[in-house]
Each structure stands twice: as structure tokens, then as C-alpha cells.
Amino acid sequence: MNKQKNNAKSSDATSANVGYEAKLWQMADALRGSMDAAEYKHVVLGLIFLKYISDAFEERHAALLAEKQKGADPEDPDEYRAQSIFWVPPEARWAHLKAQAKQSTIGQLVDDAMVGIERDNPALKGVLPKDYARPVLDKTRLGQIIDLISNIKVGDEASRSKDVLGRVYEYFLSQFASAEGKKGGEFYTPRCVVKLLVEMLEPYRGRVYDPCCGSSGMFVQSVEFIRAHAKGNGNGGKARADISIYGQESNYTTWRLAKMNLAIRGIDGQIAHGDTFHNDRHPDLKADFILANPPFNVSDWGGERLRDDKRWKYGVPPAGNANFAWVQHIVHHLVPAGVAGFVLANGSMSSN
């Protein structure tokens, strides 16, 4: 009998630790109603991001409040920016939104919060979703989602909000990708694939580039790898090596997800929006490491307009399939001793 009880306790503990994101997803998915997964992901992920920056802000705000007698000003934006924390104006703070979650105007209040954050933080300009007031979004459900996200526990110092919420953000990305089927692959590469590429390349230091970065999974995993191997990375045990992140994403809504995904992890990166073939936003970049999962067998990539491009050192790629163009773009952006790891469709390296 005691053994059974112990097993039950162990099972509960495991469920609480391992299944936390899954339980949260089940509850959030139940609130989706008839909304399409592709649309719903921006509603939920935008709110998770808002919760993250508000949590980080409130933690710093409390510390400044405690030091007010020494001259600290909790309402000075520079006090936050000096610590790489986003300034959150009063109308965007989570406590304010949570208190108004049951009001019919909650959609407009969230939109106003997003506008205020972008206004006061230029790095987020054009990144945050601002369509929570639209009529098709049920405001009762929106309030329930806010209540649900409010219950995400930050815990002790080892699992601060950016770690817990980062895990939740990534898990939700994977679930939305699964719900969207083949289309979901445009913004999410399975974690096991990303982890394999990163562990093969070991990007401890230097420039890391992803020319089709989706929601920035390659970069998140690269930084996690560095942190996990901090003691043996030849960098004095620092969790972040001398690593610079560069990426590009052609889909605007996916680019926004990428920017939020990096910000929620506290990662700086130069992530550009634009068509990598026709508007290479990092034309002079020579990277030490390139990780990528390009879209497979794209036929309408406009190759006929790039016949004389300097990137085609090993021959002009076929206009009807972009696979070989991706390979040459990657090789073009590598330093002579650089290393690349990328995923291609079956038969890409043996096709004519």
C-alpha cells in the first residue's frame, strides 16, 4: 500500500514538472473555440510575451522601490534599460490588464498596451500583435486566457519568468505548428532536429546565421547549448560566449514570432525581415556557423531573375527548385573555415 502511495506521489511530481506546459496548452486550447490555430497562436503568444516583459519589469520595479531612499526612481525608464529590461508603461502592466480582464473593453486595452510598449521600446517596433479588439475575437474567452496566463508561476530564482515562460512559449509554438500541419513547418523546426544540428556544430563563439530563421529556434538552442556547456567552452565559464546572431525571415508574421522568441529568452540578435534571395539583408556577412531548415522544393522563388547572382559560385541553380540556391547561399555566407548544418528535402544532393 505504501509503495502504491509513493508511486502515486512520484507520478504527480513528474506530471507537475514535465507536463506543466502540456496542461497549460490543454487549457488554452479549450478556450480557442472555432478560431483557426494560425490566428489563435498570435493571440496567445502575444499575451505570453506581454506577461514576460511585465514580470521582468515588476521584479526590477520592486528592487528600485526598495532603494528609493537611496535615490532610485522606479518610474525612470533608464533604470530598466540599463539592465536590458523593457520599460512597461502603466497601461501595459499585467496587473492592470488582469484587473480589467472581465470587461468588454479588454481587447482594446490589450491593443493599447501593445502600442504603448512599442512606443517606449523602439526595438519592438512593428513586432507585437495589435488586433485584440477585432469583433471576431470573443472578449470573454480573451479574459479567460489572460486569467490562465496570470497563473503561470515564476517560482524561485533558478526558474525566473523568462525561463518558465520561454519553455511555455516554445511548447506552444510546437503545438501550434502541429495543429497547422504542413504549414506549421514554415515557422517551427522540431526541437530534436534543432538540437542535433547545434550539438554537431557546437557554436561556442563567433557569428551564427540562419537565412530562413522561422521563429528563431536555431538561435534559442544555440544559446541553451552554450549555457549547458559553460564550464568547458573555453570562455572562462561564461554562459554566453562571444556569439553574434544574424537571421532573416521572409514571412512578416513569422518574423514577429522570431523577435518575440528571442526577447523572451533575453537574447540579442539582428533578425531582418525580407526575401533572402532577392533582398539579402546581411549581404556582407561571413558567418562562422550557419544552421538552417530551408523550405523544401520551392518552385516559385524567382530564380530566373537571379541568373547572374554572385552567390552561384558552383553553377546557376534551377529556376524551378530553390534547394541548390539555398545550399549556395549558405556556402557564400560562410568564412573559409566555417561550418554549416542544414536540412534539405530527400534527394536534394543527388538530383539533377
Show where each model-derived region lies.
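Non-catalytic, mostly N-terminal accessory regions of nucleic-acid modification and defense proteins
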Residues: 1-204, 270-281
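Generic recognition of stable, solvent-exposed alpha-helical segments in well-folded globular domains
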Residues: 19-22, 26, 44, 48, ...
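A generic secondary-structure signal for well-formed alpha-helical elements
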Residues: 51-64, 176, 226, 230, ...
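Extracellular loop and loop/strand-boundary signature of outer-membrane beta-barrel proteins
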Residues: 182, 314-316
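Conserved S-adenosyl-L-methionine
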Residues: 183-292, 297-301, 306-310, 344-347
